[in-house]
Amino acid sequence: MSNVQRPTFNSPRSSVLWKLLFFAIVAGYCLYYAPFGVNETDGGFLTGLAWQVLNGKTLYYDIVYVRPPLSVWLRALEIQFLPEQFAVLGERWIFYGKVALYSWLGAAVLAKGERRWQLAVFGFVVSAHCYPPMAWHTVDGILFAVMAAFFTHSKQGLNLLIAGTCLFCALLCKQSFYPLLPIIGVFLFLEKEARWKRIGWFFGGFALSFVLFFNYLRQNNLLDNFLKMTSGAASTAQAFQHGILDYFRITPALALPSILFLLPVAWWFWKGRNPRIALVAWSLWLFALVASFAAITWLRQDHTAPIAQSRVMFWVAVICILPSVLRLKAVGRISPSFLLLGISWCASVSWGYNFPMLFTTPWVLAGMEVTRVLEDASKPIRFPKPYRFLLLLSLLFTFRIAHEFVYRDGRRSEMDVHMGSIFPQLSGIYSDQETADLYLDLKKLATKYGPNFKTLPAFPQANYLTKTTPPFPLDWVVNRETNGDNTLIFKDLQEKKPVIFIQKYFRDKIESDPELEVTRLLFQRDKVVEETPHFWVVTNHDL
């Protein structure tokens, strides 16, 4: 037996340091990353829908929305309560607040003391990565789902009631969270202490929320439309593709070196031999994983998401807990990890961001656990504490490189135009001159032709920025956002006869992309009355 003492990682000074790091990094992201860039697609998606609600429209009646409603309502509340000059910047701060909160809550479920704050720090940095800060239904769903997981650890009936309500709120954000109901049911069943009492309280809260929501739909004659719009958003084949098959899509350039690095690690876990080699190989692989993303981003010179890297780490987490699940060994200990990994998986079932990167806490913990186990087996060469800080610094540096290429905008270093000088709602937001010219073009056209206008196919927050009433039942007019049913759009087009501003950015896609059916019909049949650097203005709709 070695007489090397295991160091105490829960020293008060070190614990305070990680707490300070957590809050400092979150504040730093709000100040350093939130003000830069703006886009005309995802960035205003929920804002546009919320603006429709605030203009007196009703979801599923005169607003087309193929997801459950909660995120739209939450964004409407934000617009109501945030000062106008803080509407978009505040939205981004709230995004970072949500990611920080669910990263900490997930860490609180999985760890204690200093380790909890370490996990929260790494969980936040990796989950936030270079994702564009904005109101988003997936982020809301994760927050409520992790809150449900957090409150299920309580033995008190009220907390379990809250947990059931939180889970229903997660399901009201996005359909991909529906599988959480059986997952969390299994989790509660595996908790032997006061099992049936806890299940009763939890599902009591869930059932109460369910009854209240569907009673609202029934009383407002929205139930049929709600079921029709939300049930056709994705096919079984799409769910299988994004929920299962996509996890095997890992580029060979990353997969093959990973196999070489991880062979010594697998050999130690199987045979218990050469732990020092395994620890060195594992540590080098982690740094190589981070470096590979930095290198790919810099080579592409464009916004890049860590798709393959996140899938590899998800597989690491699955491999870590799967043997215990299959043998029903230490179920009480591994079930929280299983539950949170389920949340990460549900969040990744998506049309666009179909990889487990928005909630990374469970697979970050898996990486920390592998490191801890290998350290314990290699005591003579234990890595010092700065190892964790070096990894944190490498992550922060890597994501700074990634943030240089702002999502669907330009380079951060070239963004020196204050967008608040064009629209007050964009106060505190900076972009480059090209983007500023686009927004100036919109403002001039809205002044000339407004207030009855619509941008196509995107620019979902155009009516919000110009403070005009949206004439269409949705703002991002693509077939996937209508389930291919454009009846309400054509109805509003005939009745309200808005002037249409078609974005030239989509000129190469209008003729061929089946998603742009409405834009293509209008562009082909309507009369172009004016052309600006960024838009075609069309009128005289005859469909």
List where the protein language model places each region:
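Short periplasmic/luminal acceptor-recognition loop of GT-C membrane glycosyltransferases, typified by
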Residues: 66, 181, 403-480, 498-509, ...
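Transmembrane-helix motifs of polytopic, lipid-linked glycan transferases
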Residues: 93-114
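Short acidic/glycine- and proline-prone juxtamembrane loop motifs at membrane-interface regions
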Residues: 131-142
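Extracytoplasmic catalytic/substrate-binding loops of multi-pass membrane glycan-assembly enzymes
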Residues: 34-49, 60-77, 85-86, 220-222, ...
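Specific aromatic-rich, kink-prone transmembrane helix
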Residues: 140-167, 315-320
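Transmembrane-embedded, aromatic-rich helix segments that form part
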Residues: 175-190, 259-260, 356-360
